[in-house]
Amino acid sequence: MRVSYNWLKDYVKVGLSPQELAERLTARGVVVENVVRANPGVEGVVVGRVVAMERHPNADTLWVCQVDVGGGRVLQILTGAQNVTVGALVPAAVPGAKLPGGVTMGVKKLRGLDSHGMLCSEAELQVGDDADGILILPPEPGLEPGMDVAEVLGLNDWIFELDLTANYAAHCQSMLGVAQEVAALVGGEVNRPSTYTPDAPGTDVRNLIAVQIDAPDLCSRYVARVVRGVKIGPSPLWLQARLRAAGMRPINNIVDIANFVMLETGQPLHTFDYAQIRGQRIIVRRARTGERFTTLDGQERVMDESVLVIADAERPVALAGVMGGEDSEVTDQTADILIESAHFDNINNRRTSLRYNLPSEASKRFTKGVDPSGCVAAADRAAQLMAELAGGTVVAGHVDVCPRPAVPPVILLRTERANALTGLKLTPERMAEHLRSLGMAVLTPADLAADLALGAPESDEEPGEDLGGHPVWTALHQVSPVPSDPVVYRTWAEAAWAEVEDAGSRLEALLGGGESDGKAAASGEGVSPGGASDGILVVVVPTRRSDVAVEVDLIEEIARCEGYDAIPLELPVLSSHRGGRSRQGEVKLAARRALAAAGLTEVLTHSLTHPRVYDMLALPEDDPNRRCLALANPMYEDRSTLRTMLLPCLLDVVRYNANRQVRDLAIFEISHVYRPVEGEQLPDEPLMIGLAMTGNLAPLGWNSPERPADFFALKGVVEHLLAELGVPDARFERSAHPSLHPGRQAALVVGGKPVGLLGELHPQVQERWELPGRVYVAELAFAPLMEAMLPQAVYRPVPRFPAVTRDVAVVVDLDLTAHRLETAIREAGGDLLEEVRLFDVYQGERVAEGRRSLAYRLVYRAADRTLTDEELEPVHNRVREALKALGAELRS
């Protein structure tokens, strides 16, 4: 934001140089990125009056002008501009004058005639972009030939370029907001401009325009005023200078006044040609789906119900807070002006601005936050200036529709807590001084008790009546403008008194009463002038300070007013107790290390996705994973719901890499998914482990072939993870998940409960995701694995005695799983059986159809002796008998 130093001095006595002011503002948190001269290098250019002109005898496109440049001098200056007329006041760069870029003017011969300097355009003075004609200065009292153009155009100024952070974006996006900060800095007062304009007798504005708000959630206030009989023309030079200093281009007096008031107060305004408002009615409503509207830039906009529009009785006339329409814009023929001063929802306004790519100073302010209490004052200021600068007559009264009046918050500040948090040692009086300098009202608990003891003011009181006897109630009327409309005021008064009562309840709770309905505070109990309440300040915050909502916000304001440099340097008091990870954190780290050791790369994916991914995964309509949480206001269509699975996110990563010729990939992610819970407001957020492998796991080498990813490689990674975590009693069972290949998938079961799936991606799912090769995926629930882990690792000493190996081969039916066979072998082998390994599988012509041959290697060992054949043979026979019991045929 650009702030003019000269303009700032209209509102506050600065008393500091521009550079010093910039440094001190930055130290208070209002960051001044740069201080630059407003003058781009214009020196010696004066105001000239064209007293005579004629065509150049040797050039049809040139004019020979006689220009009065003051001091009794009339110079001959030649120009090719076609907008110059006799009597026009123009910038004349006389010999010796300097223009931006370091050009020094002299006498130059053009087609045989001398030109003593030149007449300047906006572009040549670098005060605008218009290079087609000479800058014509509007005739004003006191504007005479010979005056310094830099002074006339307001170029002898300094410009502060502010970088407003979120804490200052709302209240510092106006000249008065910055002036309040400067006043607090230098200990002065803000000189707010008067908005008084005598209303024209006769018609009331309510007889000329009616306002209806059909979308109160998107528009909390709409104020309208009417000014009749205006004359459209150029703005006075002082107003043009103010706009240029702020980086805006002057257009005409009506548009310039609206922009000036926005820059001064922070409240965006819009002006309509009153004659074009059909039915003399304004309706603030949502657009209808498919409704069309042509904005001021000539573009037709197609709208839907998410767009807020300002409409008359027949059609939209503006995109609310963004841009007006062609049909109601102010033109040179406009005589009557309808002024709009409203408060629109910041999120909806930003979304509309982005949707139609219509950034503007108005939408920027609505997005960051505008004071809803300032609507009437801004409309009055604009009406005043239109009467003064455009010759208009202000119609009496306002139309003020306000379904949700803004009430200044009442915040309780504990002074001891403020000192404890900041490290400062300020008195309550010093804190109150800082807060009052920012336009806040500071009272005592006794004042609040007095309000509550007196009770609510009479409901028929009007704003401006005597408010004596109610200190906090009076402050609520003073820190921000209150509604002038009686109906709106009564609504405001109810909400304001509710704020007073709530403050009383909070005060009683602070003084030790716990939860309260405020009755004790109302009677004055525990709120005496002395005692515990001495350390509490009751602060009423203006509505323009939307960033100050709770106690710590006040503490921040006190700290920056006192100066961050005043905060003492103290080492923090550290606890001797060392922090550590939670058990979940430890297990998660162990899982990450195990998967990384297995050769997988960790990825982090976005937790937002789109419901169509579940169609791509071929999930049935009743699958629980389709029940996902949708965002109320998604920024992007593809990021509209919270994920219920990691699988689609991992497939997105595989596709992204494949599109960039990375076909060999092994990745994992350990992240949360989000699943709605029936009857609960918040979802379940289980932690999941996701794996994905594709391409080759090992490249082609001089001594080894490529090793492509397959189901068993994926299964091996899962087994490695289980072993590293110490998860016993895990097995793999057949499964039938629709996203996976029907013959190459399995369910992981731990402790008799399914905890995950693994397998090859179904070919149709692979095709929908446009993946070039086979992809192997797994998704495991983290919590059941953590619960099943052994409490601690069991140490086994290095074996001292040799092992004995025996092989056993069996022929079994195809439906008898290897897991059942291995379980039977281990149970029969007992403590002496150390290892069971399947080393051969055969299915072919030497084995009957429907059967297969499995060969196992069994390793036996005793911890305290060498096993003999006599000891081993009975154990091995038990293994054979156990296999026979399952229907296995032993092979020799």
Curated annotation (Swiss-Prot):
Residues 406-569 form the B5 domain. Its cofactor is Mg(2+). Binds 2 magnesium ions per tetramer. One of its GO terms (biological process) is phenylalanyl-tRNA aminoacylation. Signal peptide: none annotated. GO terms for cellular component: phenylalanine-tRNA ligase complex. Disulfide bonds: none annotated. It is found in: Cytoplasm. Residues 39-150 form the tRNA-binding domain. It is an enzyme of class 6 (ligase). GO terms for molecular function: ATP binding; catalytic activity, acting on a protein; magnesium ion binding; phenylalanine-tRNA ligase activity; transferase activity; tRNA binding. Pfam families: B3_4, B5, FDX-ACB, tRNA_bind, tRNA_synthFbeta. Keywords: Aminoacyl-tRNA synthetase, ATP-binding, Cytoplasm, Ligase, Magnesium, Metal-binding, Nucleotide-binding, Protein biosynthesis, RNA-binding, tRNA-binding. It catalyses: tRNA(Phe) + L-phenylalanine + ATP = L-phenylalanyl-tRNA(Phe) + AMP + diphosphate + H(+). Mg(2+) binds at D547, D553, E556, E557. SMART domains: B3_4, B5, FDX-ACB. Its EC number is 6.1.1.20. SUPFAM superfamilies: Anticodon-binding domain of PheRS, Class II aaRS and biotin synthetases, Nucleic acid-binding proteins, PheT/TilS domain, Putative DNA-binding domain. Its main location: cytoplasm. InterPro entries: aa-tRNA-synth_II/BPL/LPL, B3/B4_tRNA-bd, DNA-bd_dom_put_sf, Fdx_antiC-bd, Fdx_antiC-bd_sf, NA-bd_OB-fold, Phe-tRNA-ligase_IIc_bsu, Phe-tRNA-ligase_IIc_bsu_bact. CDD domains: PheRS_beta_core, tRNA_bind_bactPheRS. Tetramer of two alpha and two beta subunits. PANTHER family: PHENYLALANINE--TRNA LIGASE BETA SUBUNIT, PHENYLALANYL-TRNA SYNTHETASE BETA CHAIN AND LEUCINE-RICH REPEAT-CONTAINING PROTEIN 47. Belongs to the phenylalanyl-tRNA synthetase beta subunit family. Type 1 subfamily. This is Phenylalanine--tRNA ligase beta subunit. The gene is pheT.
